[in-house]
Swiss-Prot record:
CDD domains the UniProt entry points to: STKc_IKK_beta, Ubl_IKKA_like
Gene for this chain: IKBKB
Active-site residue numbers: D145
Source organism of the structure: Homo sapiens
Protein name from the UniProt record: Inhibitor of nuclear factor kappa-B kinase subunit beta
PROSITE patterns assigned: PROTEIN_KINASE_DOM, PROTEIN_KINASE_ST
Family according to the record: Belongs to the protein kinase superfamily. Ser/Thr protein kinase family. I-kappa-B kinase subfamily.
Tissue: Highly expressed in heart, placenta, skeletal muscle, kidney, pancreas, spleen, thymus, prostate, testis and peripheral blood.
Domain Protein kinase, residue spans: 15-300
Length: 756
C-alpha cells in the first residue's frame, strides 16, 4: 500500500483501493470498495515514524474501537483477509465503516453555511455529538481532539447522522507538535491541553462548545485568525461568561457574552444556547460544564432541556415579527393566546391563528397541535412550522415591515463601500451580506405565506358560504313551490265555498280562518331577502376571483431571487480565488446588491400587504354574509313549518265540513242533491206521506208511480241507516280532534234555519 500523494490502484481479493479520504499526522485513511458485494470500508494506517509510545497507544486505540458500539461513534470493522500483508509496516490496520457524507469541515465550508448551519441541522448535530461524548465519558474515554475534521456524516433513513472519528489515543502533545500544528485546529483544544496541564473530561466540553459555536455562527469564537501564542495571551483575558473574542474591521478586539448575529436560530434557542455556551467555554476547567441547576458536568442535561423544547413560532402579520414560545404538551391554546396578547397587544378575542394551509387552530386542542418534528428536515427549508397571527379588529393592513438590522460589519461597509479590507475580512463580511439578502428573501417569502394563508382561509369560508347559498336557493325554490300549491288550494276552496253558499253550508268563522291563512302565507317566502343575498354573494365571488387572478396573489420569484443569486456568485468567486490573488479589495458591488435587495424587499412587502388588505376585506364580507344567510335559512324553515301547519289546519277543516254535511243527510232525501236545501233536509218523511191519501182515486199509471215512490222511500230509509252508521264511525274517529274553534251543531242548525 503506497502512501504517496498519487495513489496507485491496488486490489486485495474482491477489494479495490479507491481515493484517499484524509491525511493526518500519523498516516492516511483510504476508501476500499468490494466489487462483489458493493460494501465500502475506510482503512486507516499509521506511519512508521511513530514513537514507541505512540505505537503502543495506536494498538490500544484499535482495541478500544473494536469494543465501542454507539450510533454516533464510527464503528470498527474486520480488516479484510490478506489486506494486512499490504501494509508497509508491522502496525495493525484499523478498518472502519465508511461514511459517504464526508466530514463536518467539508459541510461547514459550503457557501450556504458561511453564517452558520440551519436551525434543524444545528439541533441534530448537538444531539448526536452530545450523545457520543456522553458514551465515551461513561466508558472513561476522553477524546481530546474534537473538531469538524473528526466528525463525519452518514445519511440515515430520515436525517443526517453525525459520527465521531479519530479518537486521538495515539496523540502525544509535546511542545514540538504544538508548534507544528495548523493554527485553526489548536483553537478547539482546551487551554489546559495547550498549557500541558492535567486534564479531565472538561477538555471535551471546550472542544464541543467551540465546535457548536462555529456551527451556529460560521466562525470560531476566539480570534480565529490569530497565531497560537498571541491568541492564548489575549483569550485568557476573557471573563467566565464571554463566548466571543473578535476583531472588528478597525482591528479593535472586543469581548462579548452574547451570541453574535447573523445566525439562523430563533430567539428562544439563541438565548438558551447562549447561556449553554457560557458553561462550555469557561477558561477554568473546574468550572467548565457546571450548570446552575444540574451542578458539575450538568451541561449535557442542560442541553437535553434545550433540545427537548417544543416551540411554537407565531408570525405577527401586523408587524412582521416572529414570536417563539416554548410550550408544554398539555398547554391550552387559550394559555398561548394570553402570552401572545402580552407580547403583541392583540386581545385574545381578536386573535386569529392560521396554519399555512389556511386552517385555523382548533380551540379545544393543545397549543402543540401545530408542531412537527423540525429535526428531520436538516434545515433545508425555513426550519419552522409558522402559525400566522391576524388581528380581526383590523379591516386593512398597513405596511409596517422594515428589513432586519444589519450586522455591525455590514453596516460599516454600507457607510464606506469603497473602503479596502483584508481578504479574510472581505470573506466574512461578504458572506454576511449574502446572508442578509437571503434573509430578506426568506422574510418576504414568510409574509407571502401569511398572505396566502389568509387567502386559503378566505376560500374555505367562501366554500362554506357557497354551499349555504346553494342550500338557501334550493330551500327557497322548494318553499315557493309549497306556497304556490297552498295558495292555489286555498283559492280553489274559497271559490267553491262561494259557489255553494246559496244552497249549501255557510260559516263566517270558517271563511275568516281561510282568509287569514291566505294573508299569512303572503308573508312567507323570503324571495327578496334571498335575491339580495345572492346578489351580494355573487359580487363577493367576483372580487375573490379577481384576487386569485391578480399576479400579486400568486407565489412568485423575481428581483430578490436574482439579487440573491448574484450575491452568491460574487461570494463564490471571492472564496475560490487562488491564494496568490487574495489581496485587499472594496465592497462596492456587494453593497449595490444589498441596497437593491432592500428596495426590492420594501416594494414586495407593499404589494403583499395591498393584497392582504383586499383579502381581509373580502373575508370580512364573507363573515358578515354567513350569519345573514343562516338567518334567512332559519326563517325559511319557520315559513315552511307555517305552511305545513296551515295545510294541516285546512285539511282538518275540510274533514269537519264533511262531518257537518254528513250529519245533514241522515233523513230520506228526494230529488237531486243540487235541488236540496237545509229546510228540505230537515223533513225527510214529508214528501213520502203525501201521495198515500189519494192513492185509491188514481188511475192505473198513477198507481205504478205510487209504487215507485214507495220503493224510493224504502231505499231512502236504507240510505239513511247507512249514512247514520258511517257518521257514527266518523264521530268516534273525530273525537280526538280539537273542534272548539268551530260552531256547535245547534248553532249551525240555527244559522241554517235563519238562512232558509
Amino acid at each position: 500500500m503506497s502512501w504517496s500523494p498519487s495513489l496507485t490502484t491496488q486490489t486485495c481479493g474482491a477489494w479495490e483501493m479507491k481515493e484517499r479520504l484524509g491525511t493526518g499526522g500519523f498516516g492516511n485513511v483510504i476508501r476500499w470498495h468490494n466489487q462483489e458485494t458493493g460494501e465500502q470500508i475506510a482503512i486507516k494506517q499509521c506511519r512508521q515514524e511513530l514513537s514507541p509510545r505512540n505505537r503502543e497507544r495506536w494498538c490500544l486505540e484499535i482495541q478500544i474501537m473494536r469494543r465501542l458500539t454507539h450510533p454516533n461513534v464510527v464503528a470498527a470493522r474486520d480488516v479484510p483477509e490478506g489486506m494486512q500483508n499490504l501494509a508497509p509496516n508491522d502496525l495493525p490496520l484499523l478498518a472502519m465503516e465508511y461514511c459517504q457524507g464526508g466530514d463536518l469541515r467539508k459541510y461547514l465550508n459550503q457557501f450556504e453555511n458561511c453564517c452558520g448551519l440551519r436551525e434543524g441541522a444545528i439541533l441534530t448535530l448537538l444531539s448526536d455529538i452530545a450523545s457520543a461524548l456522553r458514551y465515551l465519558h461513561e466508558n472513561r474515554i476522553i477524546h481530546r481532539d474534537l473538531k469538524p475534521e473528526n466528525i463525519v456524516l452518514q445519511q440515515g433513513e430520515q436525517r443526517l447522522i453525525h459520527k465521531i472519528i479519530d479518537l486521538g489515543y495515539a496523540k502525544e502533545l509535546d511542545q514540538g507538535s504544538l508548534c507544528t500544528s495548523f493554527v485553526g485546529t489548536l483553537q478547539y483544544l482546551a487551554p489546559e491541553l495547550l498549557e500541558q496541564q492535567k486534564y479531565t473530561v472538561t477538555v471535551d466540553y471546550w472542544s464541543f462548545g467551540t465546535l457548536a459555536f462555529e456551527c451556529i455562527t460560521g466562525f470560531r469564537p476566539f480570534l480565529p485568525n490569530w497565531q497560537p501564542v498571541q491568541w492564548h495571551s489575549k483569550v485568557r483575558q476573557k471573563s467566565e461568561v464571554d463566548i466571543v473574542v473578535s476583531e472588528d474591521l478597525n482591528g479593535t478586539v472586543k469581548f462579548s457574552s452574547s451570541l453574535p448575529y447573523p445566525n439562523n436560530l430563533n430567539s428562544v434557542l439563541a438565548e438558551r444556547l447562549e447561556k449553554w455556551l457560557q458553561l462550555m467555554l469557561m477558561w477554568h476547567p473546574r468550572q467548565r460544564g457546571t450548570d446552575p441547576t444540574y451542578g458539575p458536568n450538568g451541561c449535557f442535561k442542560a442541553l437535553d432541556d434545550i433540545l427537548n423544547l417544543k416551540l411554537v413560532h407565531i408570525l405577527n402579520m401586523v408587524t412582521g415579527t416572529i414570536h417563539t414560545y416554548p410550550v408544554t404538551e398539555d398547554e391550552s391554546l387559550q394559555s398561548l393566546k394570553a402570552r401572545i396578547q402580552q407580547d403583541t397587544g392583540i386581545p385574545e378575542e381578536d386573535q386569529e391563528l392560521l396554519q399555512e394551509a389556511g386552517l385555523a387552530l382548533i380551540p379545544d386542542k393543545p397549543a402543540t397541535q401545530c408542531i412537527s418534528d423540525g429535526k428531520l428536515n436538516e434545515g433545508h427549508t425555513l426550519d419552522m412550522d409558522l402559525v400566522f397571527l391576524f388581528d380581526n379588529s383590523k379591516i386593512t393592513y398597513e405596511t409596517q415591515i422594515s428589513p432586519r438590522p444589519q450586522p455591525e460589519s455590514v453596516s460599516c461597509i454600507l457607510q464606506e463601500p469603497k473602503r479596502n479590507l483584508a481578504f479574510f475580512q472581505l470573506r466574512k463580511v461578504w458572506g454576511q451580506v449574502w446572508h442578509s439578502i437571503q434573509t430578506l428573501k426568506e422574510d418576504c417569502n414568510r409574509l407571502q405565506q401569511g398572505q396566502r394563508a389568509a387567502m386559503m382561509n378566505l376560500l374555505r369560508n367562501n366554500s362554506c358560504l357557497s354551499k349555504m347559498k346553494n342550500s338557501m336557493a334550493s330551500m327557497s325554490q322548494q318553499l315557493k313551490a309549497k306556497l304556490d300549491f297552498f295558495k292555489t288550494s286555498i283559492q280553489i276552496d274559497l271559490e267553491k265555498y262561494s259557489e255553494q253558499t246559496e244552497f249549501g253550508i255557510t260559516s263566517d268563522k270558517l271563511l275568516l280562518a281561510w282568509r287569514e291563512m291566505e294573508q299569512a302565507v303572503e308573508l312567507c317566502g323570503r324571495e327578496n331577502e334571498v335575491k339580495l343575498l345572492v346578489e351580494r354573494m355573487m359580487a363577493l365571488q367576483t372580487d375573490i376571483v379577481d384576487l386569485q387572478r391578480s399576479p400579486m396573489g400568486r407565489k412568485q420569484g423575481g428581483t430578490l431571487d436574482d439579487l440573491e443569486e448574484q450575491a452568491r456568485e460574487l461570494y463564490r468567486r471571492l472564496r475560490e480565488k487562488p491564494r496568490d490573488q487574495r489581496t485587499e479589495g472594496d465592497s462596492q458591488e456587494m453593497v449595490r446588491l444589498l441596497l437593491q435587495a432592500i428596495q426590492s424587499f420594501e416594494k414586495k412587502v407593499r404589494v403583499i400587504y395591498t393584497q392582504l388588505s383586499k383579502t381581509v376585506v373580502c373575508k370580512q364580507k364573507a363573515l358578515e354574509l354567513l350569519p345573514k344567510v343562516e338567518e334567512v335559512v332559519s326563517l325559511m324553515n319557520e315559513d315552511e313549518k307555517t305552511v305545513v301547519r296551515l295545510q294541516e289546519k285546512r285539511q282538518k277543516e275540510l274533514w269537519n265540513l264533511l262531518k257537518i254535511a254528513c250529519s245533514k243527510v241522515r233523513g230520506p232525501v228526494s230529488g237531486s242533491p243540487d235541488s236540496m236545501n237545509a229546510s228540505r233536509l230537515s223533513q225527510p218523511g214529508q214528501l213520502m206521506s203525501q201521495p198515500s191519501t189519494a192513492s185509491n182515486s188514481l188511475p192505473e199509471p198513477a198507481k205504478k208511480s205510487e209504487e215507485l215512490v214507495a220503493e224510493a222511500h224504502n231505499l231512502c230509509t236504507l240510505l239513511e241507516n247507512a249514512i247514520q252508521d258511517t257518521v257514527r264511525e266518523q264521530d268516534q274517529s273525530f273525537t280526538a280532534l280539537d273542534w272548539s274553534w268551530l260552531q256547535t251543531e245547534e248553532e249551525e242548525h240555527s244559522c241554517l234555519e235563519q238562512a232558509s
